[in-house]
Amino acid sequence: MLLAADLDCLSASDLKARALTLLGEVAALPQVVAEQRAEIARLKGLKGPPSIKPSGMEQATKPRPSASGSRRRGRGAKRVGAAIEDRVLAAEVPAGSRFKGYETYLIQDLIVRPVAIRFRRERWLTPDGRTIVAPLPAGIDGHFGPELRRFVLAQYHQGQVTVPRLVALLDAIGIAVSKRQVVRLLIDGQGRFRAEAQDVLRAGLANAAWVTVDDTGARHKAQNGTCTHIGNDRFAWFGTTGSKSRLNFLDLLRAGHSDYVINPEALAYMRSRSLAGPLIRQLAEHEAKHFADRAAWQAHLDQLGISALKVTPDPTLIATEGALWGSVKAHGLIKDTVIVSDDAGQFQVGRHALCWVHAERLVHKLDTFTDHHRVAQQRMRRLIWWFYADLKAYRRDPTPARRAALRARFDRIFKRQTGFATLDRLLARLHANKAELLVVLDRPEIPLHTNGSENDIRCHVTKRKISGGTRSDAGRDCRDAFLGLAKTCAKLGISFWDYLGARLGIPQTSAVPNLAELVANPA
């Protein structure tokens, strides 16, 4: 560090360079303070939303319609889903008038009224002393009918109505129900829905060419946690856990399986994470390769002496991550699936691609202090936007020549020296991610961004804002399952209302196939 007396020895250009460096450090301090305040708020349970403004790159690079097709297409007529009831309205006319037919006027209405049914079940005593009672109609489970249960589930999960407001609404309609009973309607007996949500995840991970992932904060049992989203254009799945580590993400990728497996994929993962060679040989040469649960795996690590090692990187952690990855592969999940993320460390597993919107946002958020800085930043943003637009064009029509040209152009853009030190360091960092940013050149079917995950996860953020956290494991699992099922139905073009009706056995409801089968077998 220079003393004040040493500043006299510096030239004007050196002083200017040092001043710019200090300005950059000072500009970074508010971000550091904001992150520390956010961490303090998180520890206090007061985590606030991030303030991130979009750069506009995605919208600006959308292909423009041709001149011939520039007119906006009309919305078209809205089809009426209900059966139409005809009513003839008579007019008062003077004598001598001639009848000229009818003028049609279509309206839609909604009838919401309470219904109470007392079933009088016949009881018979057989000659051999047995009592036979007439069974309840299909769909009756408890003292609330399937239509009421469908209404409650749709309002709470799709309509984002809170439990107190739902109770008030039902009371106003004329349904005698308490808050505790509504909570039971939302949680009790929903195992089949949770199982179907898990099956959707397995089908998606087993058959998808790509998935996007994202996470957000979640409160459970008064503790901070994380909700992770996994999905693509055909399914969505949410899972709330207490951690956002890579270990947690690998656990979620098992899609409900609880085993740990040592196979070639697991060993390759351990090598990529720099686990010591002798430890890898121990695991590879041992006869035990499959472990039913966490306890069996931990006992195996203890037997080999791996868990007793206190070195960096942690061998227990890396070996466990590898065994989880081995389990994922053993169950036929993530076969050749590309995982697209925002560069969060926990998502960097398997074939990994990065979001271009998040990459450009780093350049967009840079603080500039001179005209030279601002010109350099804007020039680089324009170059990145043009490159992004050409990547979109390549996805629509991939060719080997364009692939090679884009690779060379990437190097020219991100190896550029602008004279803005902070920007140059950022460009070098982005260039180091070349392989993950250009996965699309080999796999043009994958998206260039994670906007799908960010859009999907907003429903969870909304639920968190209006309802807070969950108090029971069943409540947490039901919330995640139904939010995922509702999003999956929307992506498959299925009405969530009809889906609930089919699953609850409501009469005269169209059958809805298992969602996992639809995800696994696209039409």
Where are these regions (language model features)?
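Short, flexible loop/hinge motifs at secondary-structure junctions
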Residues: M1-H143, V213, Y260-A319
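Catalytic center-proximal scaffold of phosphoryl-transfer enzymes
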Residues: A34, R121-L125, R130-A523
